[in-house]
Design a protein with these regions (language model features):
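Core catalytic lobe of class I
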Residues: 1-157
Length: 157
């Protein structure tokens, strides 16, 4: 009969073996997410052709808890034509600094979270900014979604 290995525990610098590994000490250091027990899904009104054109920061046409999946590819803060095209318009909401850009993303994602039904998912397509060195936009997006808005990270591609 094979000898059973003793369980390992999280150490300061990781662990060499993972069989029966108890990582609870590691995860206990993080704030536990609050998971809603509300399972109410609100109906969506008639969307016509299924498309809504507008600012994702203001989705008043959509009810709370009414969308199962949000797929978004927010504009990048890299000086593209769409940024300069609306930059001269008052109240266009075009950020002038990276911190303002992240605040705008927070507003967009907060509105997306509002319309997500319980158990709904949000898929965000972003790329890092710049090249060697680069700014990890994906890390900033994860921070907003997970730490500020309380979503659970399910994966990255």
């Amino acid at each position: 009969m094979a000898q059973r290995r003793e369980a390992t525990a999280t150490s300061e610098f990781g662990s060499g073996r993972r069989e029966n590994h108890d990582s609870s000490r590691f995860y206990d250091r993080f704030r536990a997410p609050v998971i809603s027990t509300d399972d109410t899904v609100n109906p969506v009104g008639d969307l016509g052709d299924g498309c809504i054109l507008g600012d994702a920061r203001y989705m008043g046409d959509l009810a709370d808890n009414s969308v199962a999946l949000v797929v978004t590819s927010p504009p990048y803060f890299v000086g593209k034509e769409y940024e300069t095209a609306v930059a001269g318009r008052p109240n266009a909401g075009v950020p002038t600094s990276y911190l303002e850009y992240l605040e705008m993303l927070h507003d967009v994602f907060a509105e997306c979270v509002r319309v997500l039904e319980p158990g709904g998912r949000i898929a965000v397509n972003v790329a890092n900014l710049g090249r060697r060195p680069y700014r990890s936009l994906s890390a900033d997006v994860i921070r907003i979604l997970q730490d500020e808005l309380g979503l659970l990270l399910r994966g990255e591609v």
